[in-house]
């Protein structure tokens, strides 16, 4: 059975509010601001092509990177180094969180616990992947995602962050068998 969580219009404005700390500025300013803070973060998770590319440009290597070769719904070819570790490809349509994406993120954290680095390449869209990336993350994980036209958001995963993401997931529309 095909199951996915679909973003209802009523949640769109809520998702525009940063879940963590907003680091404002044009590229590369936000990345340079957080570089020293993130140098010893483990695990470090990036969501988005521009975020992953720029974190790598400042010399950091995320343990888990989730991206879709798009930015703001336009094709984008990020300059992302190949990963020494595991590459997972998963389908996830825009505005959704699919069961395969959830499973891929859960598997990625399991692989991270065994010292592997993981890149998840999404065929479709990864914009909502921050939600399950926080839900499945161990407490203390650092998750970074982009805030369009503003900068980047830095999340230090806590139980409170997990509760907020779980609340958002519960408010999403559950679709079975594509109906």
From Swiss-Prot:
Residues the entry annotates as binding GTP: 49-51, 68, 70, 126
EC number of this enzyme: 2.7.1.237
GO-annotated biological processes: coenzyme A biosynthetic process
Domain of life: Archaea
UniProt-recorded Gene Ontology molecular function terms: GTP binding; kinase activity
Family from the record: Belongs to the GTP-dependent DPCK family.
Protein name: GTP-dependent dephospho-CoA kinase
């Amino acid at each position: 059975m095909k199951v996915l969580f679909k973003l209802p219009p009523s949640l769109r404005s809520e998702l525009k509010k940063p879940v963590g700390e907003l680091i404002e500025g044009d590229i590369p300013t936000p990345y340079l601001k957080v570089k020293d803070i993130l140098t010893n973060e483990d695990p470090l998770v990036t969501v988005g092509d521009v975020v992953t590319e720029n974190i790598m440009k400042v010399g950091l290597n995320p343990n888990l990177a989730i991206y879709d070769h798009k930015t703001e719904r336009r094709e984008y070819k990020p300059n992302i180094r190949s990963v020494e570790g595991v590459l997972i490809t998963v389908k996830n349509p825009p505005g959704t969180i699919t069961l395969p994406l959830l499973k891929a993120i859960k598997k990625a954290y399991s692989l991270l616990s065994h010292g592997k680095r993981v890149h998840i390449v999404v065929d479709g869209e990864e914009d909502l992947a921050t939600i399950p990336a926080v839900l499945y993350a161990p407490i203390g994980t650092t998750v970074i995602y982009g805030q369009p036209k503003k900068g980047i958001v830095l999340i230090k995963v806590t139980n409170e962050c997990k509760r907020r993401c779980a609340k958002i997931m519960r408010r999403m529309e559950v679709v079975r068998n594509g109906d």
